[in-house]
Amino acid sequence: SLLKRDYLLHSSGLIISGQASPALDLLLNQLPSTPGNLPVLQSHMNTYNGLYSLYFEKVHIACAAAAPEDVRSLVPGLSLTALLFCQYPMGFYVKKGNPRNIHDFPDLTRADIIFANREKGSSRRVLLDRTLKSSGISPESISGYRNELVSDYSTAAAVAGGQADVALGDSYAVRSFPELTFLPLTQETLYLIMHSENLDTPGFQAVTETISSENFRRTLALQTGYDTTHTGEIFSI
């Protein structure tokens, strides 16, 4: 609740925004074991909503897959620090063997293809819309563009269940659907964005120390296949 959020904003605990993510799940599971049993609350929201909430001081940390220049425009006038969380491939979910022969974004406009889309504000939707605009592709030419789902698992399930032919997401979700194939297209970087003035407080130190630890990086890579080469790197935005 908002009351709970406001309470935590003035406590030693942390509110971290973010959607379902194996990386965030691992972090949240490890933080309570840090000294002091740091209380942590996850606020489930997508990248853009999380950054807006950081701007309006409703969360302490935004887990966001957004380029630094996007963060600066969404959270203007503030001194922010980004902690690189992990990197992972983004691509299409299709049926095993790719029977529809889908390979790139222009294929989404074909009359025989139904797309399972994500909601506005999610990094998947941002990637899609930017690519469509730069390629001169009208969203209205894509069957299913207006049908929004709210997670990689839900879009992958739509493809697996035959409600759609293709969806856009990261590689991890496909592990739960043996009937699907993942077609990599690009790489996405996930960050933890926070106010720079909070970096030296115990809660934020616990986050940075946990993510930077060799144990966390190794476990995350083994469990997800994500690239943790630069995990724990910190820079100002």
Language-model segment annotations:
Residues C63-V75, A156-T186:
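A ligand-binding cleft/hinge motif common to bilobed small-molecule-binding domains
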Residues Y48-A62, E148-A164:
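Short helices/loops that flank or line small-molecule/ion binding pockets
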Residues V40-M45, Y145-R146, L183:
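General small-molecule cofactor/ligand-binding pocket signal
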Residues S1-H60, A66, S73-L80, R100-P106, ...:
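N-terminal hydrophobic or amphipathic helices and topogenic motifs
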Residues L26-N37, P106, R118-K120, R124-N147:
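Ligand-binding cleft/hinge of the Venus flytrap
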Residues L84-G91, L180-E209, T228-F235:
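Periplasmic-binding protein-like
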Residues T81-N117, L190-S196:
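Hydrophobic/proline-rich hinge and linker segments of small-molecule sensing/allosteric domains
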